[in-house]
Each structure stands twice: as C-alpha cells, then as structure tokens.
C-alpha cells in the first residue's frame, strides 16, 4: 500500500516551472526548492489522488504578506498596512486529513512544506474549497496527477484512495453509533 510520503515524493517529482503562474515563475530563484510556488496545484493533486471529500480531506489556505526577507505577516490590519508599503500578498495551501470521522479534523498533509525554511504556522489557515467551481481537478492539477499515475501506477493509487475513503466511512459510522441516544 502506498503512503503519503511516496505520493508526496511523486507529486514533487512531477512539478515543473510551466505549471506555475507567471507571477511565481518570474519570482523563482535557481536555489529555490522545486516545490516553491506550487502549493495550490500540489495540494489539489494530492486531495483528488487521496479521495478528496469522500475520504474526509479538506483544503486549507492561509493568506499572508511578506516584504523581501521579512517575517510573514498574518494579521489582516497589519497585512493591509504592509501591502500599502510594497509587501507582497501570498497564500499557502495544504490539506487536512480526517480524524474520528470528522472531515478536515486530523493531520496536516503539506506537499510543499519544504519551500519554507521554517515550520509553517498552520494555525493561521482556514478551511476552504479549491478555485475550481466544477468540483474537479484544475488543468494544472490534472497534469500533475497524470504524471503521478505514470510514476506510481493507477491501481496502486486507486487502492490508496479506496482505503482512505473506506477508513473515513468506517469512522463516520462509528461516530454515528456513539452519538445515538440510548433507550
């Protein structure tokens, strides 16, 4: 059975500069980790490969501002003030897994964590949906997913996805049984 670590490695190995938006591609440095700027597309690819909503996964985004090498600014008022002085508006995306049948209540799955030289402050994130209103992978995420399928195999990924979904559904049933009133 595949692990998150194996899927993460395959996603990272599938990231290429043409998948970046022009804004991020222009800001890349040759010594940046390959993950830099790919957080949304990498998180989206993992979300769908792992079973998405049916498996209890939840996208999370965190907005912040930064000015050069300065610290990240999360407070909304401070962000607005910093942005008027030239600070860049940024976001970071990751996925939260399920816990005890609760969607998005568990572990953090951050495919692109290595783009930060410190532990990202995940407590500043908020649950969200992806930017695709059709509830399907974006074109860029689909490119990454297709590359991951080639690396790891469709059957292996399907087994991982089905296990995630089955485990989440089992936990939900167990949760419902414990919440039923006793007669």
Regions found by a protein language model. Give the residues of each.
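A structural boundary/capping signal
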Residues: 1-182
């Amino acid at each position: 059975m595949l692990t998150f670590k194996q899927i993460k490695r395959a996603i990272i190995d599938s990231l290429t500069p043409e998948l970046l938006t022009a804004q991020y591609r222009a800001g890349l440095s040759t010594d940046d980790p390959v993950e830099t700027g790919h957080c949304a597309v990498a998180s989206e690819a993992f979300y769908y490969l792992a079973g998405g909503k049916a498996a209890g996964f939840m996208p999370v985004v965190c907005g912040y501002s930064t000015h050069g090498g300065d610290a990240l600014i999360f407070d909304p008022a401070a962000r607005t003030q910093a942005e008027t002085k030239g600070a860049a508006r940024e976001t970071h995306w990751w996925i939260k897994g399920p816990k005890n049948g609760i969607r998005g209540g568990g572990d953090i799955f951050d495919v692109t964590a290595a783009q930060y030289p410190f532990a990202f402050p995940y407590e500043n994130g908020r649950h969200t949906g992806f930017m695709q209103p059709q509830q399907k992978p974006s074109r860029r995420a689909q490119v990454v997913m297709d590359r991951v399928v080639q690396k790891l195999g469709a059957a292996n990924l399907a087994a991982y996805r089905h296990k995630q979904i089955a485990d989440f559904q089992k936990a939900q049933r167990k949760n419902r049984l414990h919440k039923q009133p006793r007669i």
